[in-house]
């Protein structure tokens, strides 16, 4: 039991450092070619911080553990909104630009409605469903690129540091990707062993520990953004990452190895995935995005409320 736990921790550390280096490399390259910062945050950073979820869910689906593939995607969305974004809001509430959030928020709820529709009707995420989700991902990227195409470059463009060469940035990108792949493999294999040893359903492990572990890059980004006074960037990254969790993470998983919604636990006589996880996902995203869209601000009570929801969600997961 000790070895799987240690390897699980090593996997998490690889994911954290891999995600950190990947984002540094990708952001450095984007800045080198004068790509607007908002586009970097909406695409490159979100893709980079979502890579752990992509790797974990794909490997889980390929190894026949569809519960982890599903639970990691949905669990990461809930974790991103009600823990990571909530922490940043509770610590440092502030104003945001509603216009910059409209596209990711719209895409999220369109994708979430489609995802939930499949879950409630068939419960089976087939290869065609995966391809539709990937098409949504492509559309999201295209819309962001088009929206930012005519955006002015930052007034003060920082010159790349002497030691931050193009080769170094490519190296960070490549090594980060490798660490993410290794970490994801360790996380899935040993997370499954721990779940079996404790008698805990894989879906619960995926919705809590694995989801939290693969969301750590978003947490690192959120803390960094807070430290530099860019809380809105953190919110944009969280929402963008949640879009990717639905359309990219689940899309790749379903395309590579179709999976079904897990039915390990029941709540009120129904599948807990359908009566608990989806409603919580929609609830936390609505609570996170509506004040930002209509009032242009994020308040401390909003962050505290989201944290309370996440705490209750975790307690319920381990008691049903």
Q: PLM features: what roles do these ranges have?
A:
Residues 1-320:
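Hydrophobic alpha-helical segments, chiefly the membrane-spanning helices
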């Amino acid at each position: 039991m000790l070895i799987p736990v240690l390897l699980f921790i090593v996997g998490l550390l690889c994911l954290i450092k891999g995600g950190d280096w990947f984002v540094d490399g990708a952001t450095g390259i984007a800045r080198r070619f004068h790509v607007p910062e908002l586009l970097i945050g909406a695409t490159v950073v979100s893709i980079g911080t979502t890579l752990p979820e992509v790797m974990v869910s794909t490997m889980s689906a390929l190894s026949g553990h569809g519960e982890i593939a599903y639970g990691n995607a949905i669990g990461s969305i809930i974790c991103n909104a009600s823990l990571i974004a909530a922490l940043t809001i509770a610590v440092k509430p502030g104003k945001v630009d509603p216009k910059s959030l409209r596209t990711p928020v719209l895409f999220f709820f369109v994708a979430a409605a489609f995802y939930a529709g499949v879950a409630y009707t068939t419960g089976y995420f087939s290869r065609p469903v995966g391809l539709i989700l990937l098409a949504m991902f492509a559309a999201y990227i295209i819309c962001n690129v088009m929206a930012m195409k005519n955006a002015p470059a930052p007034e003060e463009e920082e010159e790349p540091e002497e030691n931050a060469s193009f080769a170094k940035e490519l190296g960070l990108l490549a090594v980060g990707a490798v660490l993410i792949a290794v970490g994801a493999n360790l996380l899935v294999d040993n997370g499954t062993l721990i779940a079996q040893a404790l008698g805990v359903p894989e879906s619960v492990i995926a919705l809590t520990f694995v989801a939290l572990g693969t969301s750590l890059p978003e947490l690192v980004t959120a803390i960094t953004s807070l430290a530099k006074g860019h809380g809105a960037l953190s919110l944009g990254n969280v929402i963008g990452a949640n879009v990717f969790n639905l359309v990219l993470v689940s899309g790749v998983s379903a395309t590579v190895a179709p999976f079904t919604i897990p039915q390990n636990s029941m709540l009120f006589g129904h599948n807990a995935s359908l009566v608990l996880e989806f409603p919580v996902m929609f609830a936390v995203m609505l609570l996170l995005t509506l004040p930002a869209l209509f009032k242009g601000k994020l308040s401390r009570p909003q962050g505290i409320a989201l944290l309370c929801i996440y705490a209750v969600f975790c307690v319920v997961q381990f008691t049903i």
